[in-house]
Design a protein with these regions (language model features):
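Terminal helix-turn-helix DNA-binding modules in bacterial transcription factors
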Residues: 18-26, 31-36, 43, 53-95, ...
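An amphipathic alpha-helical interaction segment
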Residues: 1-8, 12-19, 47
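Short linear motifs at secondary-structure transitions and domain/linker junctions
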Residues: 5-8, 37-39, 52
């Protein structure tokens, strides 16, 4: 009985938010644009752009870079992979772009971040688990 009063827009909006998060989570390691994502989700790029700004309070590129950086940070701390391999595997086009975006977000270089996180883990007795490769 109460379900009759739920507005279609709110349900559709929640569904689009879920599909947006799911899409980025499943594809951030690949190269794709807002336009491609909108096409794949069956919405206009303007609608999708509003989802990012209203729901996540950042634009598409910022949201995508956050997902990529989060993955890269895990790899930096838990693997011995090169920074180049990590940046490319995280979806960045180049190490130069990766370094710039990383420094903007964390105020340090990826190599320093790795050193500091490992040093902190060792000094606190929490040795990071070594992983050859995350999939």
């Amino acid at each position: 009985e109460n379900f009759r009063y739920i507005e279609k827009d709110s349900v559709g909006s929640d569904d689009l938010i879920y599909r947006t998060v799911s899409y980025v989570s499943g594809n951030f390691r690949k190269k794709f644009s807002l336009e491609e994502m909108a096409h794949d989700l069956g919405v206009s790029k303007y609608v999708l752009s509003r989802v990012f700004s209203k729901t996540f309070h950042r634009n598409f590129n910022q949201y995508l870079n956050d997902a990529r950086l989060s993955y890269a940070c895990t790899r930096l701390v838990n693997t011995s992979d090169t920074i180049l391999n990590i940046c490319l595997d995280s979806g960045f086009d180049s190490q130069r772009t990766f370094n710039r975006v990383f420094k903007e977000r964390y105020k340090t270089a990826p190599s320093e971040y790795r050193k500091n996180k490992r040093r902190n883990a060792i000094s606190s007795g929490r040795i990071p688990r070594k992983v050859d490769r995350l999939s």
